[in-house]
Amino acid sequence: GKELANLRAEVGMVFQSFNLFANKTIRENVTLALIKVRHMDKKEAEQLAMDLLARVGVDSQASKMPSQLSGGQQQRVAIARALAMRPKVMLFDEPTSALDPEMINEVLDVMVVLAHEGMTMICVTHEMGFARKAADRIVFMSDGQILEENTPDEFFEHPQTDRAKDFLSKILTH
């Protein structure tokens, strides 16, 4: 009940499908939970929203509707919306898998900054360059099982399992 609600309030989530409200502006997407859930004053919520939208590089899009933004921009709005609730932990589920290749880096760059600022993040990703750069730990899973857990350097330089070696040989060919 209440304990679960309190825990959820400390966890931000960003999914591959951005889950923005299509009928709300970008600014309103970020302020909605601040006003309705956190009971923040509207002006204060709007200022925080603009600060966060600036942080992820889409503050100039604040008055637009989600359909007017690229996928990469929408995903950065989703990150700003999650950050607005001041979570202790951010969960990312394949945040770049639905994006065009040229949009991927703009989302990953924001996530790298968050990691370097000390945000605790759990990220499901196939973006190995990003994982290597941003992670403190790599947990390699296959078929629902944890096969390896290590530092990024150890995982990429000395994978322990045949499955990890095979995966890395296929994904790191270029």
Show which residues each predicted segment covers.
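ABC family nucleotide-binding domain
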Residues: 1-152
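C-terminal boundary and immediately downstream tail of ABC-type ATPase nucleotide-binding domains
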Residues: 149, 153-174
